Amino acid sequence: MSKKLLKSTIVVSSMTFFSRITGMIRDMALAQVVGSSEVADAFFVAFRIPNFLRRIFGEGAFSAAFVPVYSKIEVAGDEGKRKAFLALMAGRFGMILLAITLIGVVAAPFLVMVIAPGFLGESEKYELTVSALRLTFPYLFFVSLVAMAAGIFNSRNHFAVPAVTPVLLNLSLIAAVLWLVPIMANPAIALATGVFVAGAVQLIFQLPFLARERSLVWPRLRVGKSDKKPIEGEVNKVFRLMLPALFGVSVAQINMLINTLLASFLVTGSVSWLYYSDRLMEFPLGVFGIALATVILPTLSKQQADTSSSLFSDTLDWALRWVLLIVLPASVALMVLAGPLLTTIFQYGAFTPTDVTMASQSLVAFALGLIAFVVIKVLAPGFYARQDTRTPVRYAAIAMGVNAVLSLLLVWEFAHVGLALATSVAALVNAALLFFGLYRRGIYQPLPGWWSLLLKVAVASLVMGLVLWSGAGDTHSWIESSLLHRLGWLSWLIVVGLGVYMVSLLSLGVKPWKMMLVEKIGEEGD
């Protein structure tokens, strides 16, 4: 199991890395075309609303509820029941999504008024956002069904297809920048059209792979009388688990919506600065955090179904050690290289040096909470695998309250940076609550060696950070440099930083290869 877990994590991380690279190219194209203008703010709000719902309704809450229930059916081995469950699930989930999509398109003016009330004072920006939202909202319908397909693949430990599917969104938006923006009257509408097309393409892409898995079923709203009770019971259980999970998995996204709402009252560009800095913070979060969470949820669900309580705890411990080993130095690197990263990736065309300065400040604030964002992704499945979606909800409610209070306190003094900082603090609170919740219940028992590992990784990260800081220079030097010089300089810093970090770890006695398998955790310092 442990070798399969490691292999699956590497596969998902590799595919996600490719997806994030294409995402960076996409954002470079967006920065060059719209920068942090009114058009950019309008598109980012129009895209954030369905994307927010997709993350909590499609990928987050649905996966948290669907995977444990479906994994149990898979383990039972009844093929007829499995297909009947999928057919009923697809039919009812699809109807709910269709209804929400229609409501969203009709209620677009109200949604923009709620999410970005600051736009009401600028009628052109408000109307443009509404028009763009009516094109982007159907993306929710398509991509939530894609999330169901991903749940099927992940439950069978087939992670490659769902991990690479997001690339299609990036390619669609790049195509929109290249071919639609030049011929359409408004860039925001052109980009919104690209989002709509991306949703349909992503769903179509999944179909042949579902057929190969013998999981491509015709959606149904009812099942035969003989299957009715057990199948409907399982489908209803998914929706029951999903209701509290809707809130529990969405706290980070709700916090970002609060940021968008408050940022809409700030100077033009604030929404965009938060978007660009969030995108950079999401790179390590997606490549490692979400990839790891994707892999361990079905693993934990099967271990729970097999009542493997010891292995359940060991799997969580294995994941947390890798979070510390990879994410802590990534967080330090993001803080030290915020300016160079933003300059190299985005500072072209409409994206100005001022935008670099403002976005780098919020990136540092987001990076402070990066390890907490990843820990949440890893620990929440510890509850979801046990079909407990209510406990994470309570913790998420507390964290969201912390974010709301801090956002209101900090936004007037620190503007968009205060909003990013509030989000990071809320994530730290949420991660701490999840950790102690699992620990108090005896679900997770840390294995020996944690304090030693924490100290050694912190020292190695600090040494790496000092080397990067001394080699990075000031942001002005990066702004004045050519693209090739920026790329070469940044690549050199990344290679040197990785080398210094690895040498520091080895000098301190940390041997990462001893953490590769679940059975080997706790031996890395031997």
Residue ranges and their predicted role:
Residues 1-526:
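Membrane-embedded alpha-helical bundles of multi-pass transporters/translocases
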